[in-house]
A protein has these predicted regions:
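Tandem-repeat architecture and repeat-register "anchor" residues
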Residues: 29, 53-56, 72, 96-99, ...
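Short loop/turn segments that connect beta-strands within beta-propeller blades
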Residues: 53-58, 96-101, 147-152, 217-222, ...
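A short beta-strand motif characteristic of beta-propeller blades
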Residues: 18-23, 60-66, 103-109, 154-161, ...
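Short loop/turn segments immediately following the C-termini of beta-strands
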Residues: 45, 88-89, 135-138, 208-209, ...
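Beta-propeller domains
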Residues: 42-57
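A short helix->beta-strand "capping" segment at the edge of beta-propeller domains
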Residues: 2-25
């Protein structure tokens, strides 16, 4: 049960965390992102829409910003004004900056395998590089990269053979029931999530099914690497022993990484500077119904958490020590 005021013990101190509904009436909200012009967008994964929830409130009657998307997931703005969204069921990455009917909007990349989460790194002279999580099979995922500059955009596999597990039938398109739901759900919210660490030249990778978080610096790794090789790489693994992970976000001012544990209904804080086993780490927030994504207000004082099961984005205050 979700309590509006929760008492959380952190470092021997007890503090109060306030949890309130910020936006509601959403259909399976799965991912959020801020645009450079200050809009907070949310993907409605099974509804095929992206909505602007900047002002909060009842979103059920508001006209969607974009519609006719096929399983919209991660949203990621780029330096050149694009607003990219991963279409998981459509196998594409679409630029939704123009809004409206997604079938008429430009595709950055197609023929991908269940693209789900996105991260963008600026690699200097080569410009921005997009990293995408894909489903290589029902039980394996991979991280693929492609250039956003005036270079070859052919997707190239980067991290291979990352363990995963299938999701739930209710998070798949109706045409997949009952025979193909496992194929679609493999690219659902049990996939591996990535976060670009607020432009620090590396990204974090959550291997959700194993409760692990890695720090990925492409300059320190080979052009192509497997999950088993990554585990053995020094200083890559920053957290383990967690429950199944969903979305996460780096909090710049505190240096902490906040991640959701959907099946536990919790948000947990991880300190990447102190790698370790976080199995017994108390959550920052508990009692949520299937939380999938976390973002912060532009002043970093408030946390927003998607709750896909009840169609609500929650606003959390007091989560910082």
């Amino acid at each position: 049960m979700l309590k509006e005021v929760q008492e959380v013990k952190v470092g021997g101190r007890t503090r109060r965390v306030h949890v309130r509904p910020f936006a509601w009436g959403l259909k399976n909200p799965s991912h959020m992102e801020w645009t450079p012009d200050g809009r907070l967008l949310v993907s409605e994964h099974t509804a095929g829409t992206v909505r602007d929830i900047t002002k909060g409130g009842d979103a059920s009657e508001a006209k969607p910003l974009v519609y006719n998307l096929q399983g919209p997931a991660a949203i990621r703005p780029t330096e050149d004004g694009k607003v990219l969204v991963a279409e998981t069921w459509g196998g594409a990455i679409t630029d939704i900056a123009g809004g409206g009917d997604a079938t008429k909007l430009p595709k950055l990349s197609e023929n991908l395998k269940g693209p789900y989460t996105l991260a963008v790194l600026n690699t200097g002279k080569k410009g921005e590089t997009l990293f995408v999580s894909e489903s290589s099979s029902s039980f394996m995922t991979q991280i693929t990269r492609l250039s956003l500059g005036n270079h070859e955009r052919e997707p190239k596999a980067f991290i291979l053979d990352i363990p995963a597990r299938h999701g739930e039938p209710g998070l798949t398109p109706p045409e997949s029931w009952p025979d193909k739901w496992e194929k679609y759900a493999a690219a659902g919210c049990v996939k591996n999530w990535i976060d670009d660490a607020a432009g620090r030249g590396f990204f974090y990778l959550a291997v959700g099914s194993l409760g692990q978080i890695f720090r990925i610096n492409p300059d320190e790794l080979p052009e192509k690497i497997t999950y088993s090789e990554l585990v053995a790489h020094p200083n890559a693994l920053v957290a383990w022993g967690l429950h199944r992970l969903g979305g996460m976000r780096f909090h710049p001012s505190s240096g902490l990484l906040f991640a959701v544990q959907p099946e536990m209904g919790e948000v947990i804080a991880v300190d990447p500077a102190q790698p370790g086993n976080y199995h017994f780490q108390p959550p920052v927030v508990r009692g949520l119904r299937m939380p999938t994504c976390v973002r912060f207000s532009q002043d970093s004082e408030k946390m927003y958490v998607c709750s896909s099961a009840d169609g609500v984005v929650w606003e959390v205050e007091g989560f910082l020590t």
